[in-house]
Amino acid sequence: IGLGQFCHIVRRNIPIVYIVENNGVYGLTKGQFSATADKGSKLKSGVQNDLQPIDLCGLAIELGCSFVARSFAGDPKQLMALMKAAMSHKGTAVLDVISPCVTFNNHEGSTKSYK
């Protein structure tokens, strides 16, 4: 949701901190795959994701973003330091926060899981 706006914000270097809580699913729609879902992930219904995930950091770099970082929600010390750096950056800052969804995406095969 909002990938088109993401691209335009980055390309125009709008001074904003763009934080993505990246868990690979749309939890409010009962766990549908997001654009960042791991290939091979399965919904509880058994449907498998056959698409490669979009790498938001890679996309931001490709679009010319001058501040790009990735962190993990379970590491608050690192996350806080990155958030402070992003807020002091002049221009677009993209922070991709891997944030596990324990309801719909908590399995050993997920890169966005506690398991």
What is each stretch, according to the model?
Residues 85-115:
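Glycine/aspartate-rich loop-and-adjacent alpha/beta segment that forms the canonical ThDP
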Residues 1-27, 78-81:
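Thiamine diphosphate
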Residues 34-86:
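Conserved thiamine diphosphate
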Residues 2-5, 28-33, 105-110:
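Short acidic, glycine/serine/threonine-rich loops at helix termini
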Residues 15, 24-38, 49:
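Glycine-rich anion/phosphate-binding loop at the beta-strand->alpha-helix junction
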Residues 15-19, 58, 66-69, 92-94:
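Structural motif
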Residues 23-25, 75, 98-104:
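Glycine-rich beta-alpha junction loops
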